[in-house]
């Protein structure tokens, strides 16, 4: 085995994405895992699962298991089981929808309850999505930052539509969980806008209206 192979390490992290159904959670997870953006809104029922492997400084390979939890699961019997064992929690809201921000209190209360019963204390990140719609913002940045300071969250603003800061968000969360500091060059390289491709799930318009796509499970090949 070569020195480079010996130095290479592999880790796996469970990242759970929570928030209201229209906050853009699935678009965020899809943008990170596949660098695509689905124009059609599809409600996540229960749970969707995404995978992506990234490399952090120190030749550390990390596979992120991204659990996209359906917005309607709040108060459901399975939510605590989905959250249990997570190393990272992303609380996602739509910056143009104040209610989606207010409802994060309910999501976070579940996280706190589960954390009290778990040996794993997750890193919690507050993610303001849809910054491409800054002109329609209803949640002021100082509200976002105050919520972070009061609860010890890390702070992120992203656009799942343009890809702005999406990879950087997941990269910084993974690095913070593992105690790794990113330098300025690494942050600037990750803070890029990816081209948002429209995902066409069905080539036949008539069939699409009658039989909408039922599966949204995906992983990076």
Curated annotation (Swiss-Prot):
InterPro entries assigned: P-loop_NTPase, Small_GTP-bd, Small_GTPase
Modified residues (N-acetylserine): 2
Positions annotated as propeptide: 219-221
Post-translational modification: Prenylated.
Region (Switch II) residue spans: 68-85
Activation and inhibition: Regulated by guanine nucleotide exchange factors (GEFs) which promote the exchange of bound GDP for free GTP. Regulated by GTPase activating proteins (GAPs) which increase the GTP hydrolysis activity. Inhibited by GDP dissociation inhibitors (GDIs).
Cellular localization per UniProt: Cell membrane; Cytoplasm, Cytoskeleton, Cilium basal body; Cytoplasm; Nucleus
The reaction(s) this protein catalyses: GTP + H2O = GDP + phosphate + H(+)
NCBIfam families from the UniProt entry: small_GTP
Subunit structure: Interacts (prenylated form) with PDE6D; the interaction promotes RAB28 delivery to the photoreceptor outer segments. Interacts with KCNJ13; the interaction may facilitate cone outer segments phagocytosis. Also participates in nuclear factor kappa-B p65/RELA nuclear transport in endothelial cells.
Family membership noted in the UniProt record: Belongs to the small GTPase superfamily. Rab family.
Function: The small GTPases Rab are key regulators of intracellular membrane trafficking, from the formation of transport vesicles to their fusion with membranes. Rabs cycle between an inactive GDP-bound form and an active GTP-bound form that is able to recruit to membranes different sets of downstream effectors directly responsible for vesicle formation, movement, tethering and fusion. RAB28 is required for shedding and phagocytosis of cone cell outer segments (OS) discs in the retina. Also participates in nuclear factor kappa-B p65/RELA nuclear transport in endothelial cells.
Name recorded for this polypeptide: Ras-related protein Rab-28
């Amino acid at each position: 085995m070569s020195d480079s192979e010996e130095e290479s390490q592999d880790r796996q992290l469970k990242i759970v994405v929570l928030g209201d159904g229209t906050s853009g959670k699935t678009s965020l997870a899809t943008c990170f895992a596949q660098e695509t953006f689905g124009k059609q809104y599809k409600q996540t029922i229960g749970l969707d699962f995404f995978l992506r492997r990234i490399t952090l400084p120190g030749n550390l390979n990390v596979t992120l298991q991204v659990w996209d939890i359906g917005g309607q699961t709040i108060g459901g019997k399975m939510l605590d089981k989905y959250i249990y064992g997570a190393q990272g929690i992303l609380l996602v809201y739509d910056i143009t929808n104040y209610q989606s921000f207010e409802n994060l209190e309910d999501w976070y209360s579940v996280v706190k309850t589960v954390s009290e019963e778990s040996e794993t204390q997750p890193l919690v990140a507050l993610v303001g999505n849809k910054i491409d719609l800054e002109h329609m913002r209803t949640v002021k940045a100082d509200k976002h930052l105050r919520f972070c300071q009061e609860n010890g969250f890390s702070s992120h603003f992203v656009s799942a539509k343009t890809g702005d800061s999406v990879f950087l968000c997941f990269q910084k969360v993974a690095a913070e969980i593992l105690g790794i500091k990113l330098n300025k060059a690494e942050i600037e390289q990750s803070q890029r806008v990816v081209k948002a491709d429209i995902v066409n799930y069905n080539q036949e318009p008539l069939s699409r209206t009658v039989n909408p796509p039922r599966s949204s499970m995906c992983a990076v090949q």
